[in-house]
Amino acid sequence: MIKSKNITILGTGISGLGSAKLANKLGLNVFVSDNNIIGEKIKKYLNENKIDFEENGHDIRRLLSADQVIISPGISFVDLKKRYPEINKEKFISEIEFASRFTNAYLIAVTGSNGKTTTASLIYHILKSSGFNVGLAGNIGVSFAESVCNFSYDFYGLEVS
C-alpha cells in the first residue's frame, strides 16, 4: 500500500489521468502537473473532481513537498533531475507501480521492441476464452491505473514500455 497522502502526478496523458482517477478514488490528496497546456476536457474532469492542477511547467515546491510523485512514461526522470537537481529519486514511481499496489491481480507485463500489442492481446484473449476474469491495459488504450480504479480483475495482460 501507499504510506503517503500527498501525491503529485506529472503528465496529463492517459497514464497521468488514470493515476489521478485512482488516487482520487482512494481519497489521496492529488495534485496534477503538466509541462504543457492541459486540454479542456481534462481540465473539466480535474475541476469537477476538485483535483488541483498546474500547466505550462512544474512547481518545484510541489515536487519537493509531495510524499510520492507518479511520473508518466513520456517524461524523462533524467531530464527532470537536470532541471531540478534537488528532487529525490526515491519519491518517483511509475503509473504501473502505483496501480499495482491496489490490485491483487496477477500481472503479465509485456515489453520489448516489437509485438507488444499483439502479445498482450493474445495473452488477454487466451485467458478470457479460458474463462478467467482478465483485463487488458497499459499502452494499449486504457491505463492500468484507470482499469484498477474501475474494475476488479484476477489477471491483467499489460503492454508496458
Task: Indicate where each model-derived feature is located.
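N-terminal leader/targeting and accessory segments in enzymes
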Residues: 1-94, 98
